[in-house]
């Protein structure tokens, strides 16, 4: 709840949509691929999902209006300076608090100005792609721009995604898998939603031809390594 409230204070603009949001969703997914050093799916694949599930699939994106936040922070900074000028010298505690606020706002202004130069006035910070089937739904993919991790955007985006699923008539919303050890960042992130964990046996291969399987698996690994190098 704390992280959701942090995200709400950033005035993130949560948008739901379909293929009109695909370009921005693909960008945050590529950010996740780069951060984790993995290969996920292509933009064409996400488009195929949206085409296949039609109205039963949707994208959720969180937009951060950097320029608006910069202007708001500058206004707070000017007020802080005015309060400092009017603060009596003997009001040491209040003066100390205002000095700390002044330093904090200066850092934020500097950061926002840097972000505007890099990303423009508005940037998509994170998103999810969800499909609905029957009375349940599955959050299949989620991505985030690491440069805006401090905004806690994914916490609010996932919450709004699940809220949307329930509005569409779903009884449950599947958040995907977690580490079998019940430890790690993914578990820490998902546990704030108080999920019910369903444990399955997992994925495994049953070779029907041991000789062909060994040859095919080695070939598969080489192709995967080559694709990773050329990505």
What are the residue ranges of the model-derived segments?
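Short, intrinsically disordered/low-complexity patches at protein termini
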Residues: 38, 48-49, 83-84, 106, ...
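Low-complexity, flexible helical/coil segments
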Residues: 14-19, 48-54, 97, 165-167, ...
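Short amphipathic alpha-helical patches
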Residues: 27-31, 48-56, 70-74, 163, ...
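Short C-terminal domain-edge/linker segments immediately following a structured domain
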Residues: 11-16, 44-48, 91-93, 158-162, ...
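Active-site/acyl-donor-binding loops of N-acyltransferases
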Residues: 168-231
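Glycine-rich loops and low-complexity Gly/Arg-rich segments
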Residues: 6-9, 38-41, 85-88, 154-155, ...
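Acyl-donor binding region in acyl/amide transferases
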Residues: 120-125, 131-195
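A conserved beta-strand-loop-helix scaffold within acyl/acetyltransferase catalytic domains
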Residues: 1-149
């Amino acid at each position: 709840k704390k992280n959701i409230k942090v995200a709400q204070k950033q005035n993130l603009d949560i948008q739901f949509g379909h293929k009109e949001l695909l370009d921005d969703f693909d960008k945050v997914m590529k950010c996740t691929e780069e951060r984790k050093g993995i290969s996920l799916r292509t933009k064409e694949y996400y488009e195929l999902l949206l085409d296949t599930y039609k109205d039963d699939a949707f994208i959720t994106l969180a937009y951060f209006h950097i320029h608006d936040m910069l202007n708001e922070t500058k206004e707070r900074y000017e007020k802080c300076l005015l309060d400092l000028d009017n603060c009596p010298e003997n009001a040491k505690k209040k003066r100390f608090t205002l000095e700390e606020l002044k330093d904090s706002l200066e850092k934020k202004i500097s950061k926002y100005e840097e972000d505007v130069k890099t990303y423009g006035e508005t940037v998509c910070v994170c998103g999810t792609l969800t499909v609905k089937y029957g009375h349940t739904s599955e959050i299949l993919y989620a991505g985030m721009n690491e440069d805006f991790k401090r905004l806690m955007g994914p916490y609010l985006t996932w919450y709004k995604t699940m809220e949307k699923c329930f509005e569409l008539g779903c009884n449950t919303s599947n958040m995907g898998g977690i580490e079998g050890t019940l430890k790690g960042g993914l578990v820490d992130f998902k546990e704030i939603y108080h999920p019910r964990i369903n444990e399955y046996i997992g994925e495994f291969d049953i070779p029907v031809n041991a000789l062909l399987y060994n040859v095919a698996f080695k070939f598969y690994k080489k192709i995967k390594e080559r694709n990773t190098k050329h990505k």
